Amino acid sequence: MSDINATRLPIWGIGCNPCVGDEVTALITRGEA
């Protein structure tokens, strides 16, 4: 489960760290778009 948690850390990080959330959101947006 450590791998799953590590993969979901960025997702949870969005709510904890706005700065990290912006970077993750940008990557997700580029990936989907």
UniProtKB/Swiss-Prot annotation:
The typical symptoms of amatoxin poisoning are gastro-intestinal distress beginning 6-12 hours after ingestion, a remission phase lasting 12-24 hours, and progressive loss of liver function culminating in death within 3-5 days. One of the few effective treatments is liver transplantation. The modification 4-hydroxyproline is found at P18. There is a cross-link at I11-P18 (Cyclopeptide (Ile-Pro)). Processed by the macrocyclase-peptidase enzyme POPB to yield a toxic cyclic decapeptide. POPB first removes 10 residues from the N-terminus. Conformational trapping of the remaining peptide forces the enzyme to release this intermediate rather than proceed to macrocyclization. The enzyme rebinds the remaining peptide in a different conformation and catalyzes macrocyclization of the N-terminal 8 residues. This is Alpha-amanitin proprotein. GO terms for molecular function: toxin activity. Major toxin belonging to the bicyclic octapeptides amatoxins that acts by binding non-competitively to RNA polymerase II and greatly slowing the elongation of transcripts from target promoters. It holds the Pfam family Amanitin. It comes from the Eukaryota. Keywords: Hydroxylation, Thioether bond, Toxin. The modification (3R,4S)-4-hydroxyisoleucine is found at I11. There is a cross-link at W12-C16 (2'-cysteinyl-6'-hydroxytryptophan sulfoxide (Trp-Cys)). Belongs to the MSDIN fungal toxin family. Residues 1-10, 19-33 form a propeptide. InterPro entries: Amanitin/phalloidin (IPR027582). The modification (3R,4R)-4,5-dihydroxyisoleucine is found at I11.
